[in-house]
A protein has these predicted regions:
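C-terminal beta-strand-rich structural cap/linker in extracellular carbohydrate-active enzymes
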Residues: 498-519
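Acidic/aromatic-lined carbohydrate-recognition and catalytic surfaces
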Residues: 1-170, 184, 195-243, 378
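Beta-strand-rich binding/interaction modules
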Residues: 475-495
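Loop/helix patches that line or flank the sugar-binding groove of alpha-linked glycan CAZymes
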Residues: 220-222, 242, 270, 291, ...
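Short loop/turn motifs at secondary-structure junctions
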Residues: 10, 30, 186-188, 312, ...
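Generic enzyme active-site microenvironment
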Residues: 62-63, 191, 229, 312-313, ...
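Active-site-proximal helices and loops of the catalytic beta/alpha 8
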Residues: 51-55, 68-69, 77-87, 91, ...
């Protein structure tokens, strides 16, 4: 029902968080059946119908593939645990009867937690099963790790199989079968959860990279039109490993946090060791660009023409742009201009196009913990359920944060100056201008040591644009090497561009930004 709205934004692909049958202990990332849509969403037929309807509108559909583990309720795990060594799934998981004293201590400490099932502490789970006393987990106890083998098996640990062993090879075939099953139904790609962590004891990710290169070769042979997107967060590793797209997000290579995570937010606190102090996109104007620019420039230079870096506005795992004191439409327009003018593939998290806010202090549900505030219902219209559902408000998955109905699609559709319509304008310009699209060139023009404003160039052929961003609350200016005459194509706040012989001067009022076409 909402595909026409998505099409109206100019969106050409959607990524759905986990929709396969799940135990729902971790928001769908504990899969019971990879070949079945969870009944809470519908049926496999419903998914096929969604894909067909999306394709009719020029929208591709990508699904979430949790490749590293399953739910303990998965039939694979149940059969493996039963101890039939001739069973198909016997070696799909990592079982042992002996673990180190340190690992036993970790189990004991986890069990002292008020809710041990929600603790990610330790490596193993103790179980009374014919197959073994312990299995290796990835995160929660209900998420047993699939057995992709060990890059360097410990000769003293008989359960650590090499990647070439029958069990790990069978798991690889199963993952190909899953992808093939859904590709054949029209799915256009997969975002692979924690893609770098499949092979155990793999420093440098050499064997994990080999695995994904094999998957890529298989995909390119049989499904060349489909894409693989990794949650690796190190494009320099992920793209040569075979992925078409990798993210720069809240973990992995550093830089994203320094842009958006203020120290007094949950994610600012969790990234306190990143060494950036204040975040860049804050009206206090005390942030730095160096960490982001150094790491992005390195990754961009090493992966250009091989694949794409994606810098998402947010995702299900961390905060939205609208959080704390970054909460006005002008502030959010400056951040949206950044997301939609950088090279690579932009990802807009649902609701960020209307400025939905991260809702602080929500209770955890289905493993959300402090991620709950970024998983609230989409806000279509004013009201207690925001048009998301006709149910009673108390029955919603999480409560709505409508901000008195202002941050809704219906309110912003009517306002030509809204963030929603501004986002549409940015996407239209990105589609229309080759220099601004995924493949256009990129170069920082301003001085990284003078962070405000940030000015970068996008170019393709004879077409050039400069993007100037000032998220601080004060007026700023910068002199840059002469580029030409700058004409504002789109912007927010008061800006000016004065062209000189040797230098050009860009001036921006507080919380302002602009895209300049250079003539």
């Amino acid at each position: 029902k909402k595909l026409d709205y998505i099409q109206s934004l100019g969106i050409t692909a959607i990524w759905l968080n986990p929709v396969f049958e799940s135990g729902w202990f971790d928001g769908g990332y504990d899969v019971i059946d990879f070949y079945k849509i969870d009944p809470r969403f519908g049926t496999n037929t419903d998914m096929v119908n969604l894909i067909k309807a999306a394709h009719q509108r020029g929208i591709k559909v990508c699904l979430d593939l949790v490749a590293g583990h399953t739910s303990t309720h998965c039939d694979w795990f149940k059969e493996s645990a039963n101890g039939d060594m001739n069973g198909r799934y016997a070696d799909y998981y990592i079982w042992t009867d002996t673990i180190s004293e340190k690992d036993k201590e970790e189990i004991a400490l986890r069990h002292k937690d008020p809710n041990p099932q929600s603790s990610t502490r330790g490596r193993y789970v103790e179980i009374d099963a014919p197959r073994g006393k312990y299995y290796e987990k990835n995160f929660f106890e209900c998420q047993p790790a699939l057995n992709y083998g060990f890059a360097h098996p410990d000769p003293h640990h008989s359960w650590e199989e090499p990647v070439t062993a029958p069990g790990p090879q069978a798991v690889r075939r199963e993952i190909r079968n899953i992808m093939s099953f859904w590709f054949d139904k029209g799915v256009d790609g997969f975002r692979v959860d924690m893609a770098s962590s499949l092979v155990k004891n793999d420093p440098g990710k050499k064997e994990t990279s080999k695995l994904w290169n094999e998957m890529r070769a298989w995909k390119d042979k049989y499904y060349p039109q489909c894409v693989l997107i990794s949650e690796w967060s190190n494009p320099v590793e992920a793209i040569p490993a075979g992925f078409n797209i990798d993210f720069m997000i809240h973990f992995g290579i550093k830089g994203y946090a320094s842009l958006f995570f203020a120290p007094n937010t949950p994610w600012g606190k969790s990234n306190a060791n990143d060494g950036y102090g204040e975040c860049y996109f804050d009206k206090a104007g005390k942030g730095t660009l160096k960490q982001f620019i150094d790491n992005f420039s390195d990754a961009y230079g090493k992966t250009k023409d091989l694949g794409y870096i994606a810098i998402p506005s947010a995702n299900h795992d961390y905060q939205r742009p609208n959080i704390g004191t970054r909460n006005t439409m002008d502030q959010l327009k400056v951040t949206m201009m950044f997301f939609l003018t950088m090279p690579g593939v932009p990802f807009i998290y649902y609701g960020d196009e209307i400025g939905m806010k991260y809702q602080m202090n929500l209770p955890s549900k289905e493993g959300s913990n402090n991620r709950a505030g970024t998983r609230t219902p989409m806000q279509w219209m004013p009201g207690q359920t925001a048009g998301f559902s006709t149910c009673a408000p108390s029955q919603l998955y999480f409560p709505v944060a409508t901000d008195n109905g202002r941050l809704t699609v219906s309110a912003q559709e009517k306002d030509k100056s809204s963030l929603l319509n501004y986002t549409r304008a940015l996407i239209r310009l990105r589609h229309a201008a080759p220099a601004l699209n995924n493949d256009g060139g990129w170069e920082l023009i301003s001085n990284v040591n003078q962070p405000y404003p940030m000015v970068y160039k996008r170019f393709s052929g004879g077409e050039t644009y400069l993007i100037a961003l000032n998220p601080s609350g004060r007026k700023v200016s910068v002199n840059i090497p002469h580029q030409g005459k700058g004409i504002v194509k789109l912007g927010t706040g008061k800006v000016s561009y004065k062209s000189g012989k040797a230098f050009d001067k860009i001036q921006l009022n507080g919380i302002s930004s602009a895209i300049f076409s250079i003539k």
